[in-house]
Amino acid sequence: ELCVQSGVKSSFNCITIDGDMSTNDTVLVMANGASGVKLETPEDIYAFQQALAHVMLELAKHIVQDGERVTKFVTVHVTGGRTEDEAKKAAEAVAKSSLVKSSWNGNDPNWGRIIHAVGYCGAKVDEEKIDIDIAGLAACRGGVQADTPSDDLRQAVQVPAFQVDINLNRGEFSHTVYTTDLSPEYVDFNRCEYEYWNQAKADGLTC
C-alpha cells in the first residue's frame, strides 16, 4: 500500500490536461502472487517500489499524451523551492494556466505568461530571482528576458514534446507536473461532447 501511495504521488497526481478531475479517477494495483516473487529484504522492497513507480509514471504520461486533441506534451519542472509545497504550487499554476497552454499551442514561448502564473500561484517567490528555460534554452534570467533570440525559443516549442524548467532560486525543493497545450480543437471537442459523438455516429466514424 505504501508503495502504491508513493508511486501515485509522483505520477498520477502530477498530471493535468485542463485542470479538471473526475470523481471516477481511480488507480488499482493488484497482485495474486502468481510470480512467486517474495519481498523479504529492504532492498527487495525498494527495487519493487522503484519499478512500480516507473510503470505508474509511464502510464500517467500516456494519459496526458492521449488527451483529446492535444498537440504538445509539456513537462513543467520547478526547482529551487523553499518548501515542497512552494515548488508544487508554482508547477501546478503553470501547468494549468489557460494562457500559458494556449501560447504553447500557438508556438509562442511567452515566458512572461509563465512567470505571471508563478507569481499568482500562492507561494512566496522573488520574481527577480526566477530563471526560466524552455526546451533547454534560456528564456528568463533573474526575472527579465534572457539573451536567447526569440526565433530560437519559438522554434523550440514547435516540437510535440518539450520541457519548461523554472528555478525559483529559494531553496532545494522541486516538483514536476506533466501537461499539454490547449488547442481550439480541444475546446471544440469539449464544448458539446454529446453532440460531437452523435455527429460522429451519424458520419459513420464510430462503431
Locate each region found by the language model.
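A structural signal for small-residue-enriched, beta-sheet-centric alpha/beta enzyme cores
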Residues: E1-C207
